[in-house]
Curated annotation (Swiss-Prot):
Disulfide bonds join C240-C269, C397-C410. One of its GO terms (cellular component) is membrane. Residues 231-454 form the Fibrinogen C-terminal domain. This is Fibrinogen C domain-containing protein 1. The chain crosses the membrane at residues 34-54.
Amino acid sequence: MGSDRWKNIGGAPQMEDSVQDKSQRKGCGYILCTVLLSVAVLLAVTVTGAVLFMNHYHAPSTEPPPVITTNMEDPNALVTIERADSSHINIFIDPNCPDPFPRLEGLQSALLSALADHDSEQKVAGGKERALLTSLSDQVAQMVSQVARQRADWENVKKVQNGLGAEIGALKNEQGRLIKLLSEGQSHVAQLGSSVSEVLETVQRELGSGRPRVKADLQRAPSRSSRPRGCANGSKPRDCYDIYMSGQQEDGVYSVFPIHYPSGFQVFCDMTTDGGGWTVFQRREDGSVNFFQGWEQYRDGFGKLTGEHWLGLQRIHLLTMQTHYQLRIDLEDFENATAYALYNTFGVGLFSVNPEEDGYPITISDYTGTAGDSLGKHSGMKFTTKDMDNDHSENNCASFYHGAWWYRNCHTSNLNGQYLRGHHASYADGIEWSSWTGWQYSLKFTEMKIRPQREEN
């Protein structure tokens, strides 16, 4: 009795301990189940993120992406991932935790739906990219076709331009030939007038009377004919070439006496360049003289003969009316490079009864030289100054380009422009010879001079 009681007393704590152990084991089971469920969810989220990242990241590898499916054979597997090497990764959940399972099924469905939507978006994006590439390819093909057509058009334009250039060259040559024929015809008329005048003088002396008015009219015809070298004994030099042929062959200032201006005037003679005998009518060398002058100054001349000067349009006209003259233009830039332009036919107001009223038109052709032809296009043009607009432009070219010249619309040369000393920012308003230095370089030195045509020309 006593021992049974002791046993009962001793066994009571053992029963209480057993109940407590069962309670503790049940609590641990729930905790373990919760931990496993959390790990499974975290693992599923991680795997899903990795899969999404792999879908967005286009790796250079050609391996197919892993396939994610539900495992119908094993209901305890939440997700099965099949890799490229045919191995599988199963994500399990504890079957003893039935309560969260519906939520996991919903999560699984949402993830699979998101993956399906992502695949669909990729297909749509791929279709758009293909459409864009197709459109770009069509545009490139159209551009290539357009470039080919433009190139063909350019080749046609080039052929037409070359043909026009040849025609223009032929027309220039024909113009020079006609000018020479007209000059020779005028010379013959002048010689005929001189002969008739001599006959009239003889008749007047014999008859004691005459017709002075007719004689005066005939003498008005310009006497522009060929002449012998030098001047006859006792006669006055008509230009620097006569002086040169008389034996005076030093550069300097001399007096000349043109046929139609017997009182004469002084000129500077270049006796050294290309055989000598040149009569200088323009020089630019240091910018000491203002060449932006008016009509009267350019008609009568200005400056200093030994330095910068303009001889005068009227005097140039009187000189070039005597015979067939050639023009030489010497040029120098600020790097001391030199060039020249030679025109075998030159004159001012050759066919004018009143050259000033006609604007002192220039006649020029037959270019040779090293500077390029920047004056031939001005042939036939009248002289324009800032106060006398004779050009073809809507504006006064002399005022616009700060010079005075035989402007057309407006110029390819401007030797009476501003002395700007080399390269300048303004356009074409310096001492320009465009075929040699362009329109934005003002030359250091220019000299324009004339001489009778040589026999070999």
